[in-house]
Amino acid sequence: MIARILDGRTCAEKVKARVKENIRLLQEKGLPSPGLAVILVGNDPASATYVAHKERACQAVGIRSTVYRMPNTITESELASKIDECNRDSNTHGILLQLPLPAHIDSANLLERIRPDKDVDGFHPYNLGRLVQRRPALRPCTPYGVMTLLTETHENLEGKHAVIVGASNIVGRPMALELLLAKCTVTVCHRFTRDLAEHVKSAELLIVAIGKPGIIQSEWIKPGAIVIDVGFSRLSPNKIAGDIDFETAKERASWITPVPGGVGPMTVATLLENTLQAAQTFL
């Protein structure tokens, strides 16, 4: 068995085309284009690269993006003031606080300070609570991007045993909520999980989001499983790896995402979707 490839780039282009068309329709009605404020703290090269990629994606679909670059020495109260300013700005429909933040800043406090209806990352407790209640509003970008990508398989997810490896607030936990919403039976594995291999072997849908290359051995993968690799590690300037060895895993899976080119493009595409949704709430 050789797995079919879940191409995140192709799927993301479909999402972006829909967003672009909806923005064109807004403009035809004389309504403003969606506006996104991105707050970038410090000089982390990876964060700067991600923000530049998001800027280009916004420009391609017609979203106005403004990047506020803050020094690494900024205080939490100063950063809170910038968020408050964006909250008040009627031309800003979405706010993205680029993570990670410097160690002296409590990111949870600041994420909660963003207005829920401008929280295009979907991290505010209000938006997570809506997801818990099965009444989603703005949804966390990576998990929802994965769900959109899964529609490309045309597989019925109801009743499938989904195993998530990783329990972060950004991916693992909201991913579990999305899969419950899709009527999967969900197991979440984390650092204290015993017999990780046995859990993975039972997965009909496997989602791995740890950031440790090779943490999942290919022989653990159930033949015919759908495999989603959210991991992203830069091993060298020209080499990127996921959490699973793609070449060996694709011989067991029915569908598999590559790294790069799998989940990453879907995260950005979902951010654009969320920004449009936030703008439509205002307009």
Curated annotation (Swiss-Prot):
<dbReference type="InterPro" id="IPR046346">
    <property type="entry name" value="Aminoacid_DH-like_N_sf"/>
</dbReference>
<keyword id="KW-0368">Histidine biosynthesis</keyword>
<dbReference type="InterPro" id="IPR000672">
    <property type="entry name" value="THF_DH/CycHdrlase"/>
</dbReference>
<dbReference type="Pfam" id="PF02882">
    <property type="entry name" value="THF_DHG_CYH_C"/>
</dbReference>
<dbReference type="InterPro" id="IPR020630">
    <property type="entry name" value="THF_DH/CycHdrlase_cat_dom"/>
</dbReference>
<keyword id="KW-0511">Multifunctional enzyme</keyword>
<comment type="subunit">
    <text>Homodimer.</text>
</comment>
<keyword id="KW-0521">NADP</keyword>
<dbReference type="GO" id="GO:0035999">
    <property type="term" value="P:tetrahydrofolate interconversion"/>
</dbReference>
<dbReference type="InterPro" id="IPR036291">
    <property type="entry name" value="NAD(P)-bd_dom_sf"/>
</dbReference>
<dbReference type="GO" id="GO:0004477">
    <property type="term" value="F:methenyltetrahydrofolate cyclohydrolase activity"/>
</dbReference>
<keyword id="KW-0554">One-carbon metabolism</keyword>
<keyword id="KW-0378">Hydrolase</keyword>
<protein>
    <recommendedName>
        <fullName>Bifunctional protein FolD</fullName>
        <ecNumber>1.5.1.5</ecNumber>
        <ecNumber>3.5.4.9</ecNumber>
    </recommendedName>
</protein>
<keyword id="KW-0486">Methionine biosynthesis</keyword>
<dbReference type="GO" id="GO:0000105">
    <property type="term" value="P:L-histidine biosynthetic process"/>
</dbReference>
<dbReference type="InterPro" id="IPR020867">
    <property type="entry name" value="THF_DH/CycHdrlase_CS"/>
</dbReference>
<dbReference type="Pfam" id="PF00763">
    <property type="entry name" value="THF_DHG_CYH"/>
</dbReference>
<comment type="similarity">
    <text>Belongs to the tetrahydrofolate dehydrogenase/cyclohydrolase family.</text>
</comment>
<keyword id="KW-0028">Amino-acid biosynthesis</keyword>
<keyword id="KW-0560">Oxidoreductase</keyword>
<keyword id="KW-0658">Purine biosynthesis</keyword>
<dbReference type="GO" id="GO:0004488">
    <property type="term" value="F:methylenetetrahydrofolate dehydrogenase (NADP+) activity"/>
</dbReference>
<dbReference type="InterPro" id="IPR020631">
    <property type="entry name" value="THF_DH/CycHdrlase_NAD-bd_dom"/>
</dbReference>
<dbReference type="GO" id="GO:0009086">
    <property type="term" value="P:methionine biosynthetic process"/>
</dbReference>
<dbReference type="GO" id="GO:0006164">
    <property type="term" value="P:purine nucleotide biosynthetic process"/>
</dbReference>
<comment type="pathway">
    <text>One-carbon metabolism; tetrahydrofolate interconversion.</text>
</comment>
<feature type="binding site">
    <location>
        <begin position="166"/>
        <end position="168"/>
    </location>
    <ligand>
        <name>NADP(+)</name>
    </ligand>
</feature>
<dbReference type="GO" id="GO:0005829">
    <property type="term" value="C:cytosol"/>
</dbReference>
<comment type="function">
    <text>Catalyzes the oxidation of 5,10-methylenetetrahydrofolate to 5,10-methenyltetrahydrofolate and then the hydrolysis of 5,10-methenyltetrahydrofolate to 10-formyltetrahydrofolate.</text>
</comment>
